[in-house]
Each structure stands twice: as structure tokens, then as C-alpha cells.
Amino acid sequence: IREHLEALGYYVFAKVLNALDYGVPQKRERIIIVGFLEPVLFAFPDPIPINKRKTLTDILEKDVAAKYYVKDSIKESRLSRLKDKNYPKPYISHENMAGSITPHPYSSALRAGASANYILINDERRPTEREMLRIQGFPDTFKIVVPYGKMKHQCGNSVAVPVIKAVAEQMMLSLNI
């Protein structure tokens, strides 16, 4: 990609950025490619301080409808395979392809399609539509107008908003805008 952009006359900068470093409780590493038609001084944004980042506690809803909770059999199965039985709540657990369950204080990257990396909050329930949006850094003013499955797909395909905002701000600085 870089070679093609440079062949078209762009000055290209590329770096892997993690959404965790820009304020959302999601480990989502993505390569970000920025190109300019003129030579400019550009630097990717620095990560924000840890104490300014949102945590799961910040984004989780307090009252969640019963439809988001999993069957007792799923909950019991996951809890029996949980690696750390004393992990403090709230956590998001991730089931890998081997069936191992690992809790984390952040989400793995949300996925658009089927994935072995099935996430549950406290091994009890699926994230709500609003929580998925918050994990991606969308403001609460963002309207939910599609069903759960489509929202999950859209959030899985999205980039983390704070990452792109920070990169865009750096681009504007480089262009003196």
C-alpha cells in the first residue's frame, strides 16, 4: 500500500496504533496510514495518560435487560473454564479457539462476523448496543437505529473514534489548519 501511495506522489506515514492508548477500554491494534501530497512534518499522536482513559466501569450500563444475559448453562461452562477465578469485576472475558477463557479489564477487538473470540461481560451477558458503541468511543448521542446483529457488525467494522480523531488533529497541525 505504501509503495503504491508513494508512486502516486504521496508522502506516507504509517504506524500501528492501539485503541487502548487513546481512551477506550478495547485492545484494538490497527495500522493507520496517512498520506500528504506535499512534504510536511507529521507525527502520530502520543497515547493519552492512563488516568484519562475510560475503563469498563465507565462504559457499562447499570440496568441491563434480561435479553442480554446468557443461559445458565453457558455461564456455568464459561466460569468453569475461567483461568483466574478471583478476577475483579467488571471484566470482559474472551474465549479463544482452544476454548480457554481469559478475563481482562478491557475488550478484545470487536468483530463484525463470527469469531471464536466470543466476549461476555463478567461471564454473564453480551454487551449492549450502547456498550459496544462506547467501547469504540462513540458518544452517547449516537443514535441506535439498527437491530443488535447489525449494530454488532457495524461496531466490529468500525475504527475506534478517539484514534481517528487524534490522528486527524495531528494531520491538521501538520497542515497548519
Predicted segments, located by residue:
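S-adenosyl-L-methionine-dependent DNA methyltransferase catalytic core
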Residues: 4-16, 21, 26-177
